[in-house]
């Protein structure tokens, strides 16, 4: 568990939490026996707001290896997600000029539900998903997926092995990232290759990145 005393973004000293919910077990981990309940681990859940940049953030972070290596939620179980990503793929094809054989990279790609829509449009796809159990499902379904966390090192390896990327998706992931600077350094590993668009949620928004081209 990581105890944060500095803001993740601006590195200013964090004040005391404005909200402290005490010790909490991990979400999406229902237990089936009394013995399991007695041995269940709990972690602090407290939130501070940086007085310099205003970012609200957790003071304590459960190790990513413990949270995300074996994950429960699967994207394909949600009809709303399936409808959304189908529209998203078509929108990006039109807006960014994506076409056959372009390579689309998705960070935290889950079981490949979104990337399959790009495959249907004739594009090549690559997923980066830390949950080994879910990455295995994606690969079984024909969606090329790397079972790793996305960071500068992973991105550098992928840029060297796969070359030009035409679009990068990151949906519902940035808020889960502890080291946001390392994550963004990873995005920038592709800037010489790609038209980049970072997407967030059902309401699609774009983060402007200092890249040579942007769709």
Task: Tell where the protein language model's regions lie, with residue ranges.
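N-terminal juxtadomain amphipathic helix
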Residues: 1-80
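Short, glycine-/aromatic-enriched active-site segment of Class I SAM-dependent methyltransferases
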Residues: 29, 196-215
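Conserved class I S-adenosyl-L-methionine
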Residues: 100-110
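Conserved SAM-binding loop of SAM-dependent methyltransferases across substrates and taxa
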Residues: 111-122
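Conserved SAM-binding motif I beta-strand of class I
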Residues: 124-129
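Conserved SAM-binding strand-loop segment of SAM-dependent methyltransferases
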Residues: 142-155
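A conserved beta-strand element that flanks and buttresses the S-adenosyl-L-methionine
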Residues: 166-169
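A short glycine-rich, Lys/Arg-flanked "PGG" loop and its adjoining helix->strand segment in the class I
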Residues: 181-198
């Amino acid at each position: 568990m990581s105890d944060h005393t500095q803001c993740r973004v601006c590195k200013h000293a964090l004040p005391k939490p404005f909200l402290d919910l005490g010790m909490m077990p991990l979400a999406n981990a229902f237990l089936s026996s009394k013995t399991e309940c007695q041995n269940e681990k709990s972690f602090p859940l407290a939130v501070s707001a940086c007085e310099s940049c205003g970012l609200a953030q957790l003071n304590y972070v459960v190790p990513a290896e413990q949270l995300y290596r074996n994950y429960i939620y699967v994207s394909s179980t949600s009809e709303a997600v399936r409808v959304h990503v189908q529209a998203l793929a078509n929108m990006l094809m039109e807006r960014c000029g994506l076409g056959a054989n372009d390579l689309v990279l998705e960070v935290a790609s889950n079981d490949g539900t979104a990337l399959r829509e790009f495959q249907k449009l004739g594009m090549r796809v690559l997923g980066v998903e830390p949950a080994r159990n879910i990455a295995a499902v994606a690969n079984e379904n024909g969606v090329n997926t790397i079972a790793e966390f996305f960071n500068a090192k992973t991105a550098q390896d992928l840029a060297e092995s796969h070359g030009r990327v035409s679009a990068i998706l990151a949906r519902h992931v940035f808020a889960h990232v502890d080291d946001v600077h390392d994550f963004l350094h990873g995005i920038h590993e592709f800037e010489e290759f790609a038209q980049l668009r970072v997407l967030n949620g059902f309401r699609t928004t774009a983060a402007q990145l200092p890249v040579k081209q942007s769709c």
